[in-house]
Amino acid sequence: MPELPEVEVSRMGISPHLVGETIKTLTFRTPKLRWDIPQELKRLEGQVIRSISRRAKYLLIETDTGTAIVHLGMSGSLRVLDADFPPAKHDHVDLKLTNGKILRYNDPRRFGAWLWSAPDEIHTVLLGSGPEPLTDDFNADYIAEKAEKRKVAVKQFIMDNKVVVGVGNIYANEALFSSRINPLRSASKVTKQEWLLLTKEIKQVLATAIRQGGTTLKDFAQADGKPGYFAQELQVYGKAGEQCPNCAELIQELKIGQRNTFYCSSCQV
């Protein structure tokens, strides 16, 4: 599933080709992805793309008349192609530009979304979201205060979008391992010093993943079709039964909040 780094890599890949260009047409080959595709998106036709930003795992394609909000879901990807490039199976949305290029959205599982937001409106999917993890607003003071009296497992806590957005399963596993914090520990039991380290490691692992083009485990591809290379850097995610890179113990696997969790019971306390 594309997480924050993969979405940011997609934004960086498509932005140079789209920002400042005019939308000619929008083509929908399915009426519904995760949710119905709103026909208001047609209002973007004839509009200049002013910017492409990211909030949490959503991409915001902004024009003067409104914003297309794109979520990649479980298997979505975006590519910039020549307009005459024939659509393939699972190519559900084409945003055609007047310069002869198209932004094509592919999603085999159809669990992503294309949504509409009017100018100066905050869509309901973005309401109540926590701070971005790569900003100064996400820091040890902030998260330690949020964690007070929270008995939920620390891994589940840092994956809560109301606490901080975009810390997905892969990167939560990796950051907790780097911080030597057991993912089962209650959030309220994490010390201030450990929060200092964990917030630093979350920022570090996300920034590194972005630099390496994200993580391709199955479906994700960058805007140019290339895979993300951070999978080669994974320390514990998907490595159950293998030796811990820091000691001789085997990596354990269990589920926390219905998400696969990988950790070293010796290194992480």
Curated annotation (Swiss-Prot):
The keyword 4Fe-4S does not apply. The keyword Transit peptide does not apply. One of its GO terms (biological process) is base-excision repair. The active site is at 2 (schiff-base intermediate with dna), 3 (proton donor), 57 (proton donor), 259 (proton donor). Gene3D superfamilies: 1.10.8.50, MutM-like, N-terminal. It catalyses: Hydrolysis of DNA containing ring-opened 7-methylguanine residues, releasing 2,6-diamino-4-hydroxy-5-(N-methyl)formamidopyrimidine; 2'-deoxyribonucleotide-(2'-deoxyribose 5'-phosphate)-2'-deoxyribonucleotide-DNA = a 3'-end 2'-deoxyribonucleotide-(2,3-dehydro-2,3-deoxyribose 5'-phosphate)-DNA + a 5'-end 5'-phospho-2'-deoxyribonucleoside-DNA + H(+). Pfam families: Fapy_DNA_glyco, H2TH, zf-FPG_IleRS. DNA binds at residues 90, 109, 150. One of its GO terms (molecular function) is damaged DNA binding. InterPro entries: DNA_glyclase/AP_lyase_DNA-bd, DNA_glyclase_Znf_dom_DNA_BS, Formamido-pyr_DNA_Glyclase, FPG_cat, MutM-like_N-ter, Ribosomal_uS13-like_H2TH, Znf_DNA_glyclase/AP_lyase, Znf_FPG/IleRS. Its EC number is 3.2.2.23, 4.2.99.18. It comes from the Bacteria. Its cofactor is Zn(2+). A zinc finger (FPG-type) spans 235-269. Monomer. Belongs to the FPG family. This is Formamidopyrimidine-DNA glycosylase. The gene is mutM.
